[in-house]
Every structure is written in C-alpha cells, then in structure tokens.
Amino acid sequence: MTFGTVLLLSVLASYHGFNLDVEEPTIFQEDAGGFGQSVVQFGGSRLVVGAPLEVVAANQTGRLYDCAAATGMCQPIPLHIRPEAVNMSLGLTLAASTNGSRLLACGPTLHRVCGENSYSKGSCLLLGSRWEIIQTVPDATPECPHQEMDIVFLIDGSGSIDQNDFNQMKGFVQAVMGQFEGTDTLFALMQYSNLLKIHFTFTQFRTSPSQQSLVDPIVQLKGLTFTATGILTVVTQLFHHKNGARKSAKKILIVITDGQKYKDPLEYSDVIPQAEKAGIIRYAIGVGHAFQGPTARQELNTISSAPPQDHVFKVDNFAALGSIQKQLQEKIYAVEGTQSRASSSFQHEMSQEGFSTALTMDGLFLGAVGSFSWSGGAFLYPPNMSPTFINMSQENVDMRDSYLGYSTELALWKGVQNLVLGAPRYQHTGKAVIFTQVSRQWRKKAEVTGTQIGSYFGASLCSVDVDSDGSTDLILIGAPHYYEQTRGGQVSVCPLPRGRVQWQCDAVLRGEQGHPWGRFGAALTVLGDVNEDKLIDVAIGAPGEQENRGAVYLFHGASESGISPSHSQRIASSQLSPRLQYFGQALSGGQDLTQDGLMDLAVGARGQVLLLRSLPVLKVGVAMRFSPVEVAKAVYRCWEEKPSALEAGDATVCLTIQKSSLDQLGDIQSSVRFDLALDPGRLTSRAIFNETKNPTLTRRKTLGLGIHCETLKLLLPDCVEDVVSPIILHLNFSLVREPIPSPQNLRPVLAVGSQDLFTASLPFEKNCGQDGLCEGDLGVTLSFSGLQTLTVGSSLELNVIVTVWNAGEDSYGTVVSLYYPAGLSHRRVSGAQKQPHQSALRLACETVPTEDEGLRSSRCSVNHPIFHEGSNGTFIVTFDVSYKATLGDRMLMRASASSENNKASSSKATFQLELPVKYAVYTMISRQEESTKYFNFATSDEKKMKEAEHRYRVNNLSQRDLAISINFWVPVLLNGVAVWDVVMEAPSQSLPCVSERKPPQHSDFLTQISRSPMLDCSIADCLQFRCDVPSFSVQEELDFTLKGNLSFGWVRETLQKKVLVVSVAEITFDTSVYSQLPGQEAFMRAQMEMVLEEDEVYNAIPIIMGSSVGALLLLALITATLYKLGFFKRHYKEMLEDKPEDTATFSGDDFSCVAPNVPLS
C-alpha cells in the first residue's frame, strides 16, 4: 500500500438528529376565539389559520386568517357568509389541495332550528387562491325535516268526573291541538266509559274548516271506566287508513283518565302488546288523587310507553292540566330526535358535515359524524354530480355512536383512490375503516380496531408515502386518549393492506414518559424529507404534555419499518415560549413557506400558530493518509537507552463539505470542529503530535463548501514495544452551534446516517529479512530448580524455571504453553533477572481449559506482541500442589513454544521433564498409660508369675489412606530362662498379625546389663510381631496390646536388684511411595519400660542387742556424772523445815520454783 485513504460521512449535529429550528420560530398571534385550532399550509407561501370560536356577527361564528410567512402578520379573510349559516364555527376544519390552488374550510356546527329542535348539519366553503368562493357544500341550507304525526286523544268520560272537570279537559285538548298548528299533524278523539264514542277521525280533522270546533260539541258519556277496551278500539279502528291514519306518520296516543279501570272485560295484557306491535307511542295523564297508591301508579306505567318517566304525567286536578301542556308538547316534538326500537329516526339531521375533510380532484370528502344517530359516515361531493353517502350500512354492523368520519384521509395505491375514515367511539375502543370504490359504490375494504376502551383510536389519521413513489405505504392512526401509567396517547403504524389480507398494525409510536395525559397523537401530519435521506418524515402533536403546554415530536422515515420507532426530536412548548398552551393541537407540513428550499412545519396552539423551519443539511467527507505509509524500524527500535522523540511521519487530514439539502442558501460558511486522538483507549500513546507534544489535537475553523486539507507531523516519544498493532488515529467531527449568515440565522446539521468518528491506521515496518517472510525459531526448556523429588502434602509449591529463546526473525504473539497434571494449579509467574542489553520480559499467564479432565494447561504470552530476534528470557512459574493430588510415582510436565509465525516442525519448540513423586504422610504410634509399669518381688517369688501388658495406639493423621505395617519386639527368654509369656491382642480379628522368634544381638548379657540394667532384644531372645494394615484410613485409630505372664526367676541371672523390661513398637511403610512429614519421624517408633525390683530381707536381732547394750552404757555414764556433782547429797529435810507451812520454796544456783497453796484431798 503506497497511499492509505478511507472516506467517511461523519456526523455529530449541534443538536444531534434535530432537523427543526427552535431558536427563531415565526409566531403568528391573533386575539380571536379558537385561533390556532386548525392550520393548513396553502399556496406555497402562506398559512390559513382557523378561528372557529370567533363571534363575527350575530348568529355567525368562525373566521379564517391569511398569515404570510414573509411578514409574520395575519389578516382576516373576507368572506360572504349566507345568513342562514347560523353559528357554523367556520374554520374548525381546513384542507388544501396538493397544487395549492383550492382551500376547503368547513363549519360542521351550522344550526337550523326546526320547531322545538335544533339541527346541526354543517357547511363547507371551497375557496380559490384569491379567496373567492368556488362552491358551497351542501349547496343550500337543508330544510327542516318533514315529520308526519297522527295523534289520538282517548279521554275518560266516566261518571266519576263532574261536568266542570270534563270541560277543563276539553279545553286542554284544544290547547294541545293549537300548539301543533303549522305542522303536518292530524288529530282524532275518542271518549270512553263503559261506552265508546269516536267524536272525530283523522279524516274529519283534515276536512273540518274549524278544527277547534270539533271539540266543543263533545258531551260526557257517564258510566264505568273501560280503559283497556278503549285502547284496543283506538289501535284497531282509529289508527286505520279508513279513518285517515297515514302509514308514514308517527302514531301517538294520549290517554287522559281520573282513575283505574273498573269492570273492564279486557286486561292491559290483552291490548298493550297490540299497541306496541303497531308502533304507537303512548302518553298517560293521570288526574286526581286516585293515583297516589302504588297500584294506580303502576296502571299508568302499564298504559304508557317505556320509559315511564318520559311518558307519564300526573296532576292533582283537571285545572292543573295546563301546567303540563308545554311538557307534553316538548315530549312529542322530541319524538323526532329519538330512536325507536326498530330503527334510527335520525338520518342526517345531526350529521355535522365537514367535521373532517379531504380534498381531491375528483371531489370533496366530508366526514359526517352525526349521521344516523351518530353512527357516522362521509359524503362525497363529485363535481356537478349528486353527493354520495359512504357508511357501514351494508356491512350489517352496529355502528351506533361510533362517530365514523371523525377523521378522514385518502390513500392511493397504484392510482386507485381509497378513503380511510376513523370511528373513535366504535364499541368504546375505536376503529379505522378503508373504503374503496367497486362498481361506482363505496364498499369496505379493510378495518382495524383499537385495543383499549376510551383510547379514541381513529381520532386522527395520516396517509404516508414513505418512499415518494406515488402509492401510500402506511396509515398512521392516532389514539390520543390511550392510557399508560407514565404516558398518554399512542400512534399505530399500519401498513396499507395489499389485496384481501387482514389489516394489521405493525408498530406503535409513543411519546416520552412522564406525561400520562399528553394526548400524543391528537394531530398528525406529513412533514416531508427534512433530513434528506429520501424518506418522508412525520410530525405528531401531543398538546396535553406538561400540563397542557404541549409538545411536538418528529419521527424520521425508515426503509424497513416505514417509520423509525423512536423520535429524533421533541420540541417542547417551553423551548419556544413560556406562555404557550395546547402546542401541537394542529399540524401542517410538507411545503416550503419561507422560500429557502427547506420544508416548514406549522404548529397550532391556543391563540397562536408557530412556523418552524427545517435546517440545512450538510454532508462531510473525511479522508486521512500517512507519509510514509509505515513507521521505519530505525525509528521505533531501541534497547536500554531512552531515545529522543523521533519523527514517525506526517498525517494529512482532508474534509470535503457539500450540501445534501436542495436549499436556496448558496455557499454555506459553517463553523466546524474536529478532534484528533492518537492511540485512543491506550494508557500510554505510542505517538504524539509535534504541535501539541501530546496525543490529542483540536481544530475549530469556519469552512465553506469544498475540500480542506491540513498536514500534521507525528513523533514517537519513547521505545515502542507493540509494533504489531498499528498506531490508530481517530477523528471526531461536529458542527459548532453558530448561525450561518442566512435569513434568520439558520444553523446547519449533518446528514442523517453519517458517523461522527473516523479511524485511520499507521502500521510499523516489520523485521522480516530480505525475503520479506517473517519466521521465528523458538526454543524452550524446563527445570525444577534442583528439586529431586516432589513430595505431595509436604511441598506446597512447585517452582518451574522456563527458558525461552528466539533464534529466528521477530516472533509475533509468542506463547509458551505448559501442560501439567490436574493436581497442580497455576499460581503466579515471576521474571528472572534480565540479561544485559535486554529489557525485562513482559509476561501474562492464564489457565486455559483442556479436553482431558486429568490435564491442565497454562498459556504465558512472552513479550507480546513481538519477541524480537535473538531474544531469550527465563521466568519462573509457580504452581500450588494440592495435598490431595494423585500424581503417580512420576510427574510429567510438558512445554511448547508457539507464535503466529514460528518455523514449522521445530523440535526445540517442545520440551518435557519428569520428576519423581512421593506422598507425605503423618503416622504416629504411642504407648498408653494403662500399661503395666512396675513390679516388686521377693526372692521367695522367683518361681511365681504375674500378668503384665503393654498397650500401644497407632494413629493416621495424614490426609490420605496408606498401607502400613506395625512391628512389635518383646523380650521373652534370657539365657534360656523364660521372661514373658506374651501374646498379641489386635484390634480386629480380620487384622492379620504374625510372630517370629529373634535371637539376641549380644551373647554376653551380663556385661551389657551391668552397663544399663535394661532387658531388651539386644541381650534377650525376642518375639517379633508384625501386623499388616492394607488400608489405614485418614484419622483412623488402632489399639494393640502385648499381654502375658511375667516371670521373675531370670532376674537372679542378671545380678541386678532392679531391671527394666523394654518392648518396642515401630511403624513401617513403602518409603518409595510415602514419606513421613519432615520432623515427625520420631513418632513412628515407641517403647514401653516396665520396672522389676527385688525386695531385700533384713536380720533384726543384732540390731536389737547392740541397741540395748549401748543404752545401758549410756545410763551408767549419766549416773556417774550426777554423783560427782553431788546430786545425791542435797539436804532435803532441812529445806523443808525452813519453809512456811503452806509454802515450800526450792532454791538453787540455777533456778527457783514457788508452789501454790493447794488444798489436799
């Protein structure tokens, strides 16, 4: 490679991924009711904003505003609104044609009062580019609905009613009839008691010149109360076409009675079902106190239609009938706005046409949410043709209260137009339905239903052609009231179904968490390609976020899923103005209103509309190259001495800046910043920039479109050990948040999909000789540092000295692998003293698994990445030796040296070494205190025998089982005289013990025993016992007893009075396999000494005779001495006479004594 160049499109926008400018939006504001409720981009340069709640004049609400993007000002659009368009809320819905030549503005709340009812039909204006009204749809204000009613009075004429009350009842009938003058209502009247009389029929009422005079001649019948019979007569006779009843008219029966039926042959159960079947709506008026009881009240409920609270009236007397006259009238009028059991009486009276709209060249689509009792649908108004109503009536689906047409959108597939309608209240979860035209009739093609009650799924729709090929790819369906614990609202991404497959939604878009009442998805719009990736982007409004301040989300188009699942930008109202409310309640995008070649987004808020511009998009290409293309060996190789910084070469960085967006901004001077880093991620970089003397460098420049290059000098400040991996140069590029000199100071962003990090590499020249092929020649040896035998259990560590060398060219990735038995485990590695002119070895060892469970392996990397030619080194690997290890009698350790480029079939690269193995044990034999230790005997006992015993205990204190033998030596014969008749008592019968007679070592026992009065196997014949233990277990304990009769006659032969009888015990094992722990060898042997002592017999007569003669001689000597001293010559008699009678005093030279006067007995 002579020149390395890598190209990168790198990106890190000033606000990463943001494409809409929030620094300087254009804000339109008007003090008009509902301003910002709707907005649409129109004509490529202006916005049309609806203010549907503005009161323009009496009975006229709604106004449109023309807002110019260039000036930021709005002007009311002057329109001539016909007087009958009462309170239509003009501007609640807006739609513009794709070519910008027509605008459709609707007021779906247009009111029309018909009698006591107020109807809401809706009306729309189709406007041209100069605000001229091209068409009004519907073309005329609809007439009040024509409702026919046939009303029958069935009045009680029984005798319980006096004449005055009967006349008041007649006046009530006349008043009610007068309330329906001017309507298509016919009356008939029948009086009942036990007699029945029809006073006038519908035919008579229609033909009578004075309809009021029909009541005056009525005379009370008197009699009983046959109410059930009277109702049956009305049902079968009066509501009959022969009496003028009309088939199309509503049938109403008003029953007026003062009490319960009496002696009537019929029951209500006989007649009420017939009235129900005939579709007669019945009102019951009870007069008087007879209806205070529960039975009477129940009779009124039975007469009336359900529910009773809407069809039963009670008054205290006939004079009070006038108080219910207006209520009855309202109830009857309300029949026109209710639905019966059989069908919906509402058709299009409450349709609210224009609640949603779509504008095409083929006509106008107006959503009619109120049609057919709010089942909903849509009207298509083709040019110069009658309108077509589109709904679900042919699908046999209950759509009552579904609001079909709440939202309207068009979808195109290969030139075929499809209509998509939202029904957010369908079965309380919501639905979206696709209609297509088949044989000039619009039929359902597909539908998808919401999943959560109350979510309002289908409240908003958006048709998206992601790849701009002219066919709709997917439909976005908003469910703004979808509730989750931390967010509110979601938008389903539903690909347009192909063929007859079931319509399904593949993904869901959500706003940020923390906004459970955010109403995400309340408004949707196609934004256009704002990030210049050839895919259409969308915007979604969430006007309820942050306590109804609102926010708008931007989602980019994606080639695979259609729409990216995560938003690229969230614009909170607080970023624009602290006083905004419901920001995002209306959206409109897809046009360039500011004439800069960039798409703009209009966002409606309460009382304001904001125009957000998209930002210009730049593409930045980065190329990096090095000269020379490799770092020379002469630059990076060194030994002990530290080199001064040497030049590694030059790095040239080139930036190519070009525009991605097709804007009208000309040459863009943008402020850019790029950060360079050498060897990022390493603790110490191998190279630095000459300019900064460290591995990082930052540049910030203002650059225009084109190519911009800069050359930087690189230095190597230190010896380089790792010359295998190249020096990495990272470049991080970003645009600085500074406005460009353009209208309103737009800030450019980088193209989406670009990266923000560029990497280039500078390799090192390899030391491969003239042939260009690098081949190492490794060798390795092992030694155990003079250790002759490994004693397991005693040697806790094993040090292995490893020597490795390279006799070839540079070796890359040199590894020494050690293979050893599983009883060893790698502990540490340490380097030996380094050789002159060589740096210390860099070692890193790790244990690696092997397939053989009895074998372990360690890998030690040596001087990674390069073990240079001629290098050698020695290091010590220390292993822990498990005290439980079983290594056999010899341990084998193998070593192999390898690398990425080592010479093949080199015998020096492998080495193996064996070491003898023994196993440390700790066995102990000890004498027991229970043994016989002392005997004394007399000469007379020489022929007697006494039992004696020596006890020994053997313990295994090792960590392993082993086979041992215990030998005992006991003296049994001295010079042919029996000493001890001993036998062995082993701890178990299964333990074999054998005995053997051993002669003495010295025949001259007298000489030996005179030196040491000890009887042992050196002078006596001994009996040797050997007990073999094939498996002496860990912590096992064995007791042995030497027991037998001891003789004393042999002691005379020793010429000694006191002799020690000694037995000896000793443990033996295979010393080629086992070794007693160092310092514990003495515990393998023990001896027991038993003292024998002869008692001496003495003659006492000579002693006694000698003692007696000596005593007599002593007595004679004492007597003679006393005599010479005059002891026997003292005058006791005179001394007694000289004393008083009661006292005797003895005097002498040496003492005196006074005797007390003691009375004599």
From Swiss-Prot:
Please provide the Gene Ontology terms (biological process) for this protein.
Answer: cell adhesion mediated by integrin; cell-cell adhesion; heterotypic cell-cell adhesion; immune response; integrin-mediated signaling pathway
- Annotated source species: Homo sapiens
Source lineage:
Eukaryota, Metazoa, Chordata, Craniata, Vertebrata
Quaternary assembly: Heterodimer of an alpha and a beta subunit. Alpha-D associates with beta-2.
Binding-site residues, Ca(2+) 1: 465, 467, 469, 473
Tell me where the signal peptide lies.
1-17
> One MF term in GO for this entry?
metal ion binding
Q: What is this protein called?
A: Integrin alpha-D
Which residue positions carry a glycan here?
59, 87, 99, 391, 690, 732, 872, 956, 1045
* Residue span, VWFA domain: 150-332
